């Protein structure tokens, strides 16, 4: 449960059924892909046990010219759950912390309420395209 697989779930050159309709103007890219992936968030202090790790799953649209990424949209979170079955997670969010023509790094955060409130954080890097 530690690593969430990254799956390309849509390619605008091949697939008909969009998963997340892009907000970007078509002129700025040749095609786009939607990826489904996730980030594992860990806590510190009283919440540092790996048994409390949280998985945040999300979709992200990435725009390409030729084989190079030229932009992206805000990730769309689809869920948060305990990697090992723990509960009490809320407020999942994922942002793109950096990206280049062939790589994208995400930062995930969520709250865990279990006797106290803890902030869980993690990062995930995916290769493009």
Regions from the PLM with identified roles:
Residues 1-48:
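N-terminal prepro-regions of secreted/extracellular proteins
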Residues 13, 25-26, 97-105:
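Short, ordered beta-strand-loop transition motifs
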Residues 13-14, 66-68, 112-114:
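Residues that cap or initiate secondary-structure elements
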Residues 16, 52-54, 116-118:
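Short acidic/polar mixed-charge low-complexity motifs
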Residues 36-44, 76-79, 107-113:
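Generic short beta-strand segments
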Residues 46-103:
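Mature extracytoplasmic domains of secretory-pathway proteins
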Residues 107-129:
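Short, exposed beta-strand-loop hairpins at the edges of beta-sheets
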């Amino acid at each position: 449960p530690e690593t969430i697989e990254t799956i390309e779930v849509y390619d605008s050159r091949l697939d008909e059924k969009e998963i997340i309709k892009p907000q970007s103007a078509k002129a700025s890219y040749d095609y786009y892909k939607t990826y489904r992936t996730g980030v594992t968030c860990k806590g510190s202090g009283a919440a540092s046990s790996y048994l409390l790790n949280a998985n945040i799953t999300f979709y992200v649209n990435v725009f390409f010219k030729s084989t190079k990424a030229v932009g992206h949209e805000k990730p769309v979170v689809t869920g948060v759950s305990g990697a090992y079955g723990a509960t009490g997670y809320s407020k999942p969010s994922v942002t793109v912390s950096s990206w280049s023509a062939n790589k994208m790094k995400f930062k995930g955060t969520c709250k865990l309420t279990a006797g106290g409130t803890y902030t869980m954080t993690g990062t995930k890097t995916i290769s493009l395209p």
